[in-house]
Amino acid sequence: MTNYAIILAAGKGTRMTSDLPKVLHKVSGLTMLEHVFRSVKAISPEKAVTVIGHKSEKVRAVLADQSAFVHQTEQLGTGHAVMMAETQLEGLEGHTLVIAGDTPLITGESLKSLIDFHVNHKNVATILTATAQDPFGYGRIVRNKDGEVIKIVEQKDANEYEQQLKEINTGTYVFDNKRLFEALKCITTNNAQGEYYLTDVVAIFRANKEKVGAYILRDFNESLGVNDRVALATAETVMRQRITQKHMVNGVTFQNPETVYIESDVEIAPDVLIEGNVTLKGRTHIGSGTVLTNGTYIVDSEIGQGSIITNSMIESSVLAAGVTVGPYAHLRPGTTLGREVHIGNFVEVKGSHIGEKTKAGHLTYIGNAQVGSSVNVGAGTITVNYDGQNKYETVIGDHAFIGSNSTLIAPLEVGDNALTAAGSTISKTVPADSIVIGRSRQVTKEGYAKRLAHHPSRSK
């Protein structure tokens, strides 16, 4: 059995009120088009053809070499859109899935079941349908007394009886590929919209006494077509619930799943505890036994097992096992932390490697640095890495002790086991095993404070 797919992605999406093509709006971190394409891959299509139109280059860039593309210059209806794929698929033996690119909730399992139903029942066309409590706006499935599908009627063309029907057309179909393009040559624009309706091929097949079937979705949510921001928010809510449920089934604990935002490509190992208001985005991986506390935000990062991240932001960073971060820390892109590193309150690290068991507990900036293992970085330490034009590296050796309020002016190297005195400004190489003091000598003037206007003795 050879399968093909046609994805309809040419529309502007006027009701979205956006410069962005409708299918490129995102749901849980992926464009709607990407969600649809991933589900389509469940049927293993020999060829996928995406129909593009409005801002076509942006749409094409999302799927790139994963799909063939055809251009629909004028949007003259769904039938016209499918006609555009004729140059790619006409005459081929097999079954063709037709699906809209704005249906991000459809699952691969449902599409696979649709194809299987179509093949097993030897249909020339199979419609994916759903039962709607409020069917207004949807095309209705009209059956005869024997339950056979005889036609699909659009809302604007439906009579009073047809408008009461609750079985609706989801806009997803499977056709015998050859018969699809033969039937498309017979449809017209004689309808309320003045468009070429893809649904009109059903009546053509029925007139030829060819078999048309309908496969009913179990979950109505999968039928959602996103046409405005309200529907986009609905899709986001459903997708977020799916994602959290998937992770819970796989052994992840959520204290308040309704408040968590996790994107589609995030991976979470078992025995992770996630508190409320946590955001995980992009290609993030969370290792087993990790705890993410309230307010944590992580994007495109790897967190090693057994780590504790407390109310902190982590971007494009890699953390080894047993790391503790926060509260209120910020790990910026290019940061790597070795095993059992501690990054504490109000510490910012950017583009740096921190060796295992090193600690930077408070109020510190580490940028463009290579920090060894078992280093203590005192409170208020700053790596001065930027001169207004270029950035420079700071290298700190193993077991070094950086005193509080040290200012390290790069390029700079502090050797193994070296110590910088608190309050020092260091601008030259510090040899291994050295102590360096880079501050002014303290001067004490006894009794001098009594001369100052604010001294209590002057207010008498």
Curated annotation (Swiss-Prot):
<feature type="binding site">
    <location>
        <position position="22"/>
    </location>
    <ligand>
        <name>UDP-N-acetyl-alpha-D-glucosamine</name>
    </ligand>
</feature>
<dbReference type="GO" id="GO:0008360">
    <property type="term" value="P:regulation of cell shape"/>
</dbReference>
<feature type="binding site">
    <location>
        <begin position="77"/>
        <end position="78"/>
    </location>
    <ligand>
        <name>UDP-N-acetyl-alpha-D-glucosamine</name>
    </ligand>
</feature>
<dbReference type="Pfam" id="PF00132">
    <property type="entry name" value="Hexapep"/>
</dbReference>
<keyword id="KW-0963">Cytoplasm</keyword>
<dbReference type="GO" id="GO:0019134">
    <property type="term" value="F:glucosamine-1-phosphate N-acetyltransferase activity"/>
</dbReference>
<feature type="binding site">
    <location>
        <position position="379"/>
    </location>
    <ligand>
        <name>acetyl-CoA</name>
    </ligand>
</feature>
<feature type="binding site">
    <location>
        <position position="154"/>
    </location>
    <ligand>
        <name>UDP-N-acetyl-alpha-D-glucosamine</name>
    </ligand>
</feature>
<dbReference type="InterPro" id="IPR001451">
    <property type="entry name" value="Hexapep"/>
</dbReference>
<dbReference type="GO" id="GO:0005737">
    <property type="term" value="C:cytoplasm"/>
</dbReference>
<dbReference type="InterPro" id="IPR011004">
    <property type="entry name" value="Trimer_LpxA-like_sf"/>
</dbReference>
<keyword id="KW-0133">Cell shape</keyword>
<feature type="binding site">
    <location>
        <position position="439"/>
    </location>
    <ligand>
        <name>acetyl-CoA</name>
    </ligand>
</feature>
<dbReference type="InterPro" id="IPR029044">
    <property type="entry name" value="Nucleotide-diphossugar_trans"/>
</dbReference>
<feature type="binding site">
    <location>
        <position position="350"/>
    </location>
    <ligand>
        <name>UDP-N-acetyl-alpha-D-glucosamine</name>
    </ligand>
</feature>
<keyword id="KW-0808">Transferase</keyword>
<feature type="binding site">
    <location>
        <position position="102"/>
    </location>
    <ligand>
        <name>Mg(2+)</name>
    </ligand>
</feature>
<keyword id="KW-0961">Cell wall biogenesis/degradation</keyword>
<dbReference type="GO" id="GO:0016020">
    <property type="term" value="C:membrane"/>
</dbReference>
<dbReference type="GO" id="GO:0006048">
    <property type="term" value="P:UDP-N-acetylglucosamine biosynthetic process"/>
</dbReference>
<feature type="active site" description="Proton acceptor">
    <location>
        <position position="362"/>
    </location>
</feature>
<keyword id="KW-0511">Multifunctional enzyme</keyword>
<feature type="binding site">
    <location>
        <position position="227"/>
    </location>
    <ligand>
        <name>Mg(2+)</name>
    </ligand>
</feature>
<dbReference type="InterPro" id="IPR050065">
    <property type="entry name" value="GlmU-like"/>
</dbReference>
<comment type="pathway">
    <text>Nucleotide-sugar biosynthesis; UDP-N-acetyl-alpha-D-glucosamine biosynthesis; N-acetyl-alpha-D-glucosamine 1-phosphate from alpha-D-glucosamine 6-phosphate (route II): step 2/2.</text>
</comment>
<keyword id="KW-0460">Magnesium</keyword>
<protein>
    <recommendedName>
        <fullName>Bifunctional protein GlmU</fullName>
        <ecNumber>2.7.7.23</ecNumber>
        <ecNumber>2.3.1.157</ecNumber>
    </recommendedName>
</protein>
<keyword id="KW-0548">Nucleotidyltransferase</keyword>
<feature type="binding site">
    <location>
        <position position="404"/>
    </location>
    <ligand>
        <name>acetyl-CoA</name>
    </ligand>
</feature>
<dbReference type="GO" id="GO:0071555">
    <property type="term" value="P:cell wall organization"/>
</dbReference>
<feature type="region of interest" description="Linker">
    <location>
        <begin position="230"/>
        <end position="250"/>
    </location>
</feature>
<dbReference type="InterPro" id="IPR038009">
    <property type="entry name" value="GlmU_C_LbH"/>
</dbReference>
<dbReference type="InterPro" id="IPR005835">
    <property type="entry name" value="NTP_transferase_dom"/>
</dbReference>
<feature type="binding site">
    <location>
        <position position="169"/>
    </location>
    <ligand>
        <name>UDP-N-acetyl-alpha-D-glucosamine</name>
    </ligand>
</feature>
<comment type="similarity">
    <text>In the C-terminal section; belongs to the transferase hexapeptide repeat family.</text>
</comment>
<keyword id="KW-0677">Repeat</keyword>
<feature type="binding site">
    <location>
        <position position="332"/>
    </location>
    <ligand>
        <name>UDP-N-acetyl-alpha-D-glucosamine</name>
    </ligand>
</feature>
<comment type="subunit">
    <text>Homotrimer.</text>
</comment>
<feature type="binding site">
    <location>
        <position position="227"/>
    </location>
    <ligand>
        <name>UDP-N-acetyl-alpha-D-glucosamine</name>
    </ligand>
</feature>
<keyword id="KW-0012">Acyltransferase</keyword>
<dbReference type="InterPro" id="IPR005882">
    <property type="entry name" value="Bifunctional_GlmU"/>
</dbReference>
<dbReference type="GO" id="GO:0009245">
    <property type="term" value="P:lipid A biosynthetic process"/>
</dbReference>
